[in-house]
């Protein structure tokens, strides 16, 4: 049981813990739901081009797919459900109308229903995290799975922010997840710079998935046909009462400078001179 | 229960050279979201599990020994696309079957031809004409991929003139005795279940044909040597030999003397589904040519910058897209119950002839390299040519269409 009442803590902290306790009991007594956030991104195999006006990357007439790390997140959620630890896997995607395609892929993989928060704005991780928090308040999942990062912005922030906003424990860069149903704990191996770290996190928790966690299944043909009848609920940011004002403004997007070919140096002195005065690394 | 096919490492994807080109973006007017998902899924499956074997299948003239492609396709629910769900099928229509056929053909022409013979010529004929008992007996194993199916109508002396077949079925107590030969039977060497047409009444012309279900191992039924073909190598084809082969009464498909209706109506749908084969080959040609012309340089520039090459590629693309539109529109009509023999013949007539030309141009775009067997283009041409011949030659298809147009008011 988590430490619930600390006399020195602020009222807001205490009430958050009370919510945690309620959720904790809630999750112990009922089979849980898993919420999986899936992002629609430019397909990993596409050659990226920057728009001429430098406001972003070209996405018109470009192949889009589910973020590969989100696929891994969804796969893990499906496996947990198939092992009997969860009763429902809900896929959620935030973005334009075409996100429905991404959700349909998720449904075809085996998710039970989808939620589409429709918007044409580009939202940065904090806004996404706020939206996911609102959804978690409504759906009360026992686990929230996200990919560790999206391959278009490589932010690696959303999962961590969702956990902080909810006051839930987080285990990021998961390469192995084992659930203990009785203790309501997830044991997660994390891939960190120093190697592998193993954490026990009390549920409900946020887990972000790394490459080696699993290999996502193909959407089987029968499941693709069945997915047609699975529901996708449409919502707006207004429905969820989320403040979408962002403190970050994207000024410009440019391609990295073209890689120059290597230069043969004639002596160590010349090498040091170049490292110091051209590359500015020493 | 998890179902995993070959390993899909994302790292592997990033490192491996691109095999798939994105010129496969067919018009979204052709397909709705579910059909696009279906196509994407079969495409992934075929590229991961079939395409890696394509070259070796062609070189060795046989399916791979280390992996059972029939079972793999069966596990992916590919065989029974048009079969009822109670037998393990998907209960879908010809549109979906064509989508699957195109994507498998894109990975390997030989595998697609064998797949088409198994899933359409055999399985679909049983679905359309079989009794409940026959479907119960034969469909489950065919749909799972445990058994391979085939169909035999042509004979050494009866190709285009298929109604002139000489294979005889003499009525005896409890069944029939079959005597004769069948030629160019796809999957013949490995099939456990075969639909075979024979003459129960040699004097009644077309009305004397009856369709039978033959099982491998029936006494008097044997297969002769595997044929050594120009293309579609690996899609085993052979001659069937019937020497006093007893076939029980219950193995008649539909009714005695009604075989020609089974045959002709089956041919319409066979032509439609097989028409997706050349579509896949044309797509494979583009998959091979586009990366090549982007990277091959002559006169200091990629050859894809030159007008002649761009012209060829444009012609290849439009040939593919227009054939695709025809095939899938007709598939939609057939799913809605409007089967027009003219259009069914038209789709394969059109797609097959274009595919041969596209494959020739693909070789030309690769220049000297196109003539080297290390590149796929030679195989694509040899595979494409079959579609102008099998399922009724182009000449027969023209007669079917022209004759009908002449007769119509």
UniProtKB/Swiss-Prot annotation, chain B:
CDD domains: IVD. Its EC number is 1.3.8.4. Disruption phenotype: No visible phenotype under normal growth conditions. It catalyses: 3-methylbutanoyl-CoA + oxidized [electron-transfer flavoprotein] + H(+) = 3-methylbut-2-enoyl-CoA + reduced [electron-transfer flavoprotein]. It is an enzyme of class 1 (oxidoreductase). FAD binds at residues 151-160, 184-186, 296, 307, 364-368, 393-395. The active site is at 270 (proton acceptor). Signal peptide: none annotated. Pathway: Amino-acid degradation; L-leucine degradation; (S)-3-hydroxy-3-methylglutaryl-CoA from 3-isovaleryl-CoA: step 1/3. It holds the Pfam family Acyl-CoA_dh_N. GO terms for biological process: alternative respiration; branched-chain amino acid catabolic process; L-leucine catabolic process. It is found in: Mitochondrion. It comes from the Eukaryota. Residues 1-22 form a transit peptide. Keywords: FAD, Flavoprotein, Mitochondrion, Oxidoreductase, Transit peptide. Disulfide bonds: none annotated. SUPFAM superfamilies: Acyl-CoA dehydrogenase C-terminal domain-like, Acyl-CoA dehydrogenase NM domain-like. Expressed in leaves, stems and flowers. Not detected in roots. The keyword Secreted does not apply. One of its GO terms (cellular component) is mitochondrial matrix. One of its GO terms (molecular function) is flavin adenine dinucleotide binding. Its cofactor is FAD. Substrate binds at residues 160, 206-207, 261, 268-271, 391-392. Homodimer. Belongs to the acyl-CoA dehydrogenase family. This is Isovaleryl-CoA dehydrogenase, mitochondrial. It comes from Arabidopsis thaliana (Mouse-ear cress). The gene is IVD.
